[in-house]
Amino acid sequence: MISLSSVAIALTTVVGALALPSDQSVNLAARQAITSSQTGTNNGYYYSFWTNGAGSVSYSNGAAGQFSVNWANQGGGDFTCGKGWNPGKAQDISFSGTFTPNGNAYLSIYGWTTGPLVEYYILENFGSYNPGNGMTHVGTLTSDGSDYDIYKHTQVNQPSIVGTSTFDQYWSIRKNKRSSGTVTTANHFSAWASHGMNLGSHNYQILSVEGYQSSGSASMTVSAGSSSSGGSGSGSGSGSGSGSGSGSQTTTAGSSTGTGTGSGSGSGSGGSGGNCAAQWGQCGGQGWNGPTCCSSGTCKASNQWYSQCL
């Protein structure tokens, strides 16, 4: 996972910190303080905690998707922690709680993909430093009640989930900061793809709290909504022709029309346009249980895990 010192001038060592923990898979039945790096499962959620060992930081897992952390890292300390899923996916993620940093810290939906290797952030709140200041701005997105600035940044020879590598970071940084709400991740994944920023197969995905040379506290709860999709409607139509021609149909969300052409006999019928994903929405992939049709555009596979309406 990324060290907050990573991007641009103010961020020099960076990312992949969450990739560094040894592969300890610890099932914790009771709440307990964690002060050394580890990953595991707790109450049905994947969790990850990493610290560089400087300063003071204490992480605790709570019931279901709840976790808390207190830190005082002014002397060079760096940590990242949170709960979520492994693997992640395009899904609506709800979160709530308190995030009270004093200095440089992030609250984000954070994850990795492979093929290509990508580290991504949907940054919902941050402390004294906006990491976008050191990255390349590629566009904007409006989602979940706010505009987000989209950035891309390349990490060269930095820690990652597959070891030291060169890889891209994708960022969406929310303009109206918040500590509670729902993130429609498919909107971000689709917006990134529209700028040529494609994801691969999902690795872990968590609600993350990070702090670098700062102090503060956070108590957060994360939960999953439905897999992200969009667009609904219904319609019916029919078409007929005489002679040996053929019928054709056009269906859009909410309405459809059918036409028949030719000099023989033919017919076409328009079907339902309901329950189809909107443009940029997810429409397929391994394990996907949502809509597999598109109300606009064509369903195209990005990889075995993710197809979207383009």
From Swiss-Prot:
Domain GH11: 33-223
Membrane-traversing stretches: none
Domain spans labelled CBM1: 275-310
pH sensitivity of activity: Optimum pH is 5.0.
Signal peptide: 1-19
InterPro entries in UniProt: CBD_sf, Cellulose-bd_dom_fun, ConA-like_dom_sf, GH11/12, GH11_AS_1, GH11_AS_2, GH11_dom, Glyco_hydro_11
GO biological process, one term: xylan catabolic process
Biased amino acid composition, Low complexity: 218-227, 247-256
EC nos: 3.2.1.8
Assigned GO CC terms: extracellular region
Induction field: Induced by soluble xylo-oligosaccharides, with beechwood xylan being the best inducer.
Primary location: secreted
Region described as Disordered: 218-274
Temperature characteristics of this protein: Optimum temperature is 50 degrees Celsius.
Reaction it catalyzes: Endohydrolysis of (1->4)-beta-D-xylosidic linkages in xylans
GO molecular function, one term: endo-1,4-beta-xylanase activity
Function: Endo-1,4-beta-xylanase involved in the hydrolysis of xylan, a major structural heterogeneous polysaccharide found in plant biomass representing the second most abundant polysaccharide in the biosphere, after cellulose. Hydrolyzes birchwood xylan, beechwood xylan, and oat spelt xylan to produce short-chain xylooligosaccharides, xylopentaose, xylotriose, and xylobiose as the main products.
Protein name as annotated: Endo-1,4-beta-xylanase B
Record lineage: Eukaryota, Fungi, Dikarya, Ascomycota, Pezizomycotina
Gene: xynB
